[in-house]
Amino acid sequence: MSRILTFNAGSSTIKLGVFESAASEEVRPLAGGVLDLRVSPLELKFNHDGSRETIELDAAVSDDLGDVIDALLAWLEAKFEGEAFSAAGHRIVHGGLHFDAPVWLDEAIIDRLDELSPLAPLHQPAGLKLVRAMQRARPRLPQVACFDTAFHRTQAPLVTRMAIPRALHEEGVRRYGFHGLSYESIADTLRNEEPALLAKKLVVAHLGSGASLCAMEGGVSRDTSMGFSALDGIPMATRPGELDAGVPLYLQQQRGMSVDELQQWLYHECGLKGVSGISADARVLLESDAPEAREAIALFCFRTARDATLGMPRLIIPSLQVNMRAGEVPTDKDGRPMLKVPLNGL
């Protein structure tokens, strides 16, 4: 029996999973948790065997995450009776042109992935920082990277191209798409539980702080709303989604914004937060009576419906057959989604 750790590193949280496998069995989930790096002492919310517990870890958050990973691994190994883990898997957002499948990580590959950090500045550095922290803490532990962009490599060349000079496209300035591990998980679930549904043409939505749509056919990606970066597509918590390229030019030329200020604005000041002026949290906006909050939610729903019905499907999906959700969508006390996207309203 072997146990595998999985990580999804963000700028303020680390999501982790523990999986178990035997030679004759499929890998099965054993436990999971979220480590919040924003509070002191650190809080690990952990689910195992149907029970939930909150653990305080005595570790300081440093730039290299060294103390955090040491404390986390010590607690996990004690929790599972001192048994060492056999491998660690990481969600790495961007695989660029060269990585279209999971890959064993070594220094050379980590350095190549770090070169992609400007394309995913919120996610790539955080993921690689955790990889390096694990390397220092457990240098002999094999580590694997799984890429969000890899799922979308099945798209036709025309879908990945933008109307820019060919030389830039060949250098890698093209549409990649993201949230691929989420979409791959949905496809795998359908393959096991609803194979007839998987064979159809679907539009799937990943709705969380980051949000996107994916057009699938036979369980593979044919188009997606995100493109070159995780800024594109439908509106998000703090990101604008699709935006006329003239807007950043205007802000730079007429308002004097620097490149760093533009990046901060695009990644942290737009979306639900920017439209409402109240919050990036859809739950807060749904409970608010402010007209700005209602407008932010209405815009999100309109743009999502527009892209799901008039965007991707117009090229590859003649009739929209099903809409599925992944991610963290606010629900009411009965578990029903509180964000209702009027797909048939257009």
What is the role of each PLM region?
Residues W75-H123, P142-V144, A150-R161:
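Short beta-strand-loop/turn "lid" adjacent to the catalytic site in phosphate-handling enzymes
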Residues I4-T6, A87-G89, V144, L202-H206:
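Short glycine-aspartate micro-motif
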Residues F151-Q254:
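Glycine-rich phosphate-binding loop of actin/hexokinase-like ATP-binding domains
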Residues I4, T13-S62, G227:
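Short glycine-rich, Thr/Ser-proximal phosphate-binding strand/loop in the N-terminal lobe
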Residues A74-S86, L190-A196, A308-P318:
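Phosphate/pyrophosphate-binding loops at sites that engage ATP/ADP/AMP, CoA/4′-phosphopantetheine
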Residues Q264, H268-G311:
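Adenine-nucleotide phosphate-binding core of ATP-dependent small-molecule kinases
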